[in-house]
Amino acid sequence: MKALLLADENTSHRFAGACRQIEAGFPIIHIADWQGGAYLSAKDPALLMALRESGMALVGFGRASIPMHAGKLTRESLGHAGVILFRRSVSAIAYGKQARLLVSFWGEAADWDWADRIEYLPRP
């Protein structure tokens, strides 16, 4: 199955692995394993545009910058393929919690239109 979600550099490989432990074949790849790690140090706009071309949503913790850049791309009619961000209440080292939140959410959200959409986990 083609990966539909990209875990950003602020997440751990353990997070992606935990998602696949909960659900075998879960469609996520860590940024270090995508495109040979070419986007590990990429600026947010470049990463969002590359993900748009690949049809992949970004998953991560970049609450300060990602929404701003995603919104700018949308306003400029360039768009993005979707963003899922963890709220401050989710610890960056709580891989199991991150995985449970994402796998549960993705069961509901996988078929949504993700173009220019930003979601936060956990949902209110």
Language model segments and positions:
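Acidic, metal-binding active-site segment of PIN/NYN-like and related structure-specific nucleases
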Residues: 44, 51-52, 56-73
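Acidic, PIN/NYN-like endoribonuclease modules and their adjacent C-terminal/linker elements
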Residues: 3-35, 45, 70-124
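Residue-level preference for short coil/turn positions at secondary-structure junctions
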Residues: 1, 52-54, 79
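A general structural signal for short secondary-structure boundary/capping elements
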Residues: 50-55, 103-107
